[in-house]
């Protein structure tokens, strides 16, 4: 539901509410009822907009914090066949640059519900200096293991950027493998290899290692910390704190709320049916080359 729809629902709520309470003779009661019901209908519309939305704060060495607002919503879904088409959108504020990411994806659930197979495509646009790119990606996920691969294609060419410097969005790729920490189903480790193709200069490449934890007592909060290990140059440490604005009340999320920190089995191989709307793991910031240095928007 978009903002226009929320406004229309709220607007229509007023006359409908008046009809509901027209028999009430008390004008104060009528006024209070109209206000209460209008607020309730607005809250219902607002909550539905943020059913699967999250806010992330990222801090890293040598850079100001950045903020990301991201949402994932279904386009079409066939539960009987176990497939889903979805939309993922986000907006990022980093280093006084705003980047918008718009993507669509398709996911298929395996017959035993233990695996998700997915493909996706995105368009990224940084409106401050008009950089843009496309990407295609693929993913394979279970509750204990996952692999994510993305290929990025710059399409905007040279731009006049900050302080009059020439900037370019870069092509690149990343391949990431993730796995559950044995006996701790709320924790995962990730290792990612990436490379960005330098324009008339050396490529920028390296690896990223991170640990992600979902607190069992607070399933709407995720903490991920790690380091970006450059083949050349100074490594960068980072911490991401993500808050899910709307949990939606799904069964899997309720289960996460009460799951134990330590499990009886080394790896938790559970159904992935309720994970079909998890976000695509990708590099949402456009990697920019300025004065022959890849920054980010950066790596």
What are the residue ranges of the model-derived segments?
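Repeated loop/turn-to-beta-strand initiation elements of outer-membrane beta-barrel proteins
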Residues: 50, 77-86, 111-119, 144-149, ...
């Amino acid at each position: 539901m978009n903002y226009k729809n929320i406004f229309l629902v709220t607007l229509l709520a007023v006359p409908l509410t008046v009809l509901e309470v027209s028999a009430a003779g008390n004008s104060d009661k009528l006024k209070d009822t109209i206000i209460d019901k209008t607020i309730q209908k607005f809250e219902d519309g607002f909550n539905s907009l943020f059913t699967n939305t999250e806010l992330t704060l990222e801090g890293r060495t040598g850079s100001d914090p950045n903020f990301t607002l991201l949402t994932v919503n279904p386009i079409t879904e066939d539960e009987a066949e176990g497939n889903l088409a979805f939309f993922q959108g986000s907006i990022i504020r980093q280093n006084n640059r705003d980047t918008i990411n718009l993507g669509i994806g398709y996911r298929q659930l395996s017959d035993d519900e233990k695996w998700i197979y997915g493909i996706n495509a995105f368009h990224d646009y940084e409106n401050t200096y008009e950089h843009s790119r496309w990407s295609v990606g693929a993913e394979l996920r279970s509750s204990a293991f996952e692999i994510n691969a993305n290929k990025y294609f710059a399409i905007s060419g040279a731009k006049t950027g900050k302080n009059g410097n020439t900037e370019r969005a870069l092509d690149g790729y990343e391949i990431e493998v993730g796995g559950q920490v044995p006996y701790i189903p709320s924790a995962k480790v990730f290792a990612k290899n990436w490379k960005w193709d330098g324009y008339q200069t050396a490529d920028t490449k390296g690896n990223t290692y991170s640990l992600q934890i979902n607190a069992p007592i607070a399933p709407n909060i995720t903490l991920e910390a790690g380091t970006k290990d450059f083949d050349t140059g100074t490594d960068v440490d980072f911490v991401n704190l993500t808050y899910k604005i709307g949990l939606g009340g799904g069964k899997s999320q309720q289960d996460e709320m009460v799951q134990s920190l330590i499990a009886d089995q080394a790896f938790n191989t559970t159904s992935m049916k309720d994970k079909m709307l998890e976000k695509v793991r990708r590099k949402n910031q456009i990697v920019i080359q300025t004065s022959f240095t890849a920054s980010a928007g950066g790596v």
